[in-house]
Amino acid sequence: MTNKLLSIKIADPYAEAFFQLSLSLYIKNNDPDLFYQLIFDIQDFLKLLKETPELDNFLKNPLNSNILKKNILNKIIENKFNLQTINFLNLLIDKKRIDTIQTIGKIFLEKAYEFVCIKFVEVWSTIELSQKQQENLIQKINILLGPIFSEPSVQFYKIQLTLMLDTNLLGGLIIKMGSKIIDLSLRNELQQLGKKLDITI
C-alpha cells in the first residue's frame, strides 16, 4: 500500500466522524450557519497551515508534546474557530493524527461540498482570471456537469474555484474536479502535436 493510500485509509474515519458531527449539529439545532462555519473553519485551517509552514512542521514534529501543541494551537485559533472545530483538532493531537490533517480536511471538505452540492474546482492558468472570466468558467463547468434533478425543482451545482498560477502552461487552463483533469493548456496541445510528429517538447 502506498503512503498516499495509507494516509487516506487513516484519515477517512476522522473526516467521516467530523462530517457526521457537523450534520448532527445542523439537524439538531436547525442551524445551517453552524454547519457552514465548521466547513469554513477547516478551509481556513488548511489555508493557515499552507501559509505558515512553521506551524505545520511544529504540529507534525513527534518530539513536541501534545500539551505544548494544544497550547500553541489554541492560542492561535481560540477566538477564530468554532469550539467544535477546536475540540476536533485537539482530538487529532491526542490521537497523534494531526500530521494527517491536510488529508482529513480535504476528505471532510469533499464530503461537505457534495452534501451541499458544491463542486470544489482547482484551476491553473498563466495569468490571473478576471471576475468575468471566472463567472464564464463557472457557467461552462455547470454546463459540463449538468443539472441536479431533485424534487420539486432542478438546480445546478455551486462551483467554488481555487485559482493558481502556472507560467509553465504557456497559455490556456488546466481544470481539476475531484479525480477528473481537463487539460486545455497550450503546453498540452504542443505535447500532443509533438507526439504526432515524434518530437519531444
UniProtKB/Swiss-Prot annotation:
Single GO cellular component term: chloroplast thylakoid membrane
Primary location class: plastid
Keyword Plastid: yes
Disulfide topology: none
Similarity annotation: Belongs to the ATPase delta chain family.
Subunit field text: F-type ATPases have 2 components, F(1) - the catalytic core - and F(0) - the membrane proton channel. F(1) has five subunits: alpha(3), beta(3), gamma(1), delta(1), epsilon(1). CF(0) has four main subunits: a(1), b(1), b'(1) and c(10-14). The alpha and beta chains form an alternating ring which encloses part of the gamma chain. F(1) is attached to F(0) by a central stalk formed by the gamma and epsilon chains, while a peripheral stalk is formed by the delta, b and b' chains.
Function: F(1)F(0) ATP synthase produces ATP from ADP in the presence of a proton or sodium gradient. F-type ATPases consist of two structural domains, F(1) containing the extramembraneous catalytic core and F(0) containing the membrane proton channel, linked together by a central stalk and a peripheral stalk. During catalysis, ATP synthesis in the catalytic domain of F(1) is coupled via a rotary mechanism of the central stalk subunits to proton translocation.
Protein name: ATP synthase subunit delta, chloroplastic
Organism expressing this protein natively: Vaucheria litorea
Gene that this polypeptide is encoded by: atpD
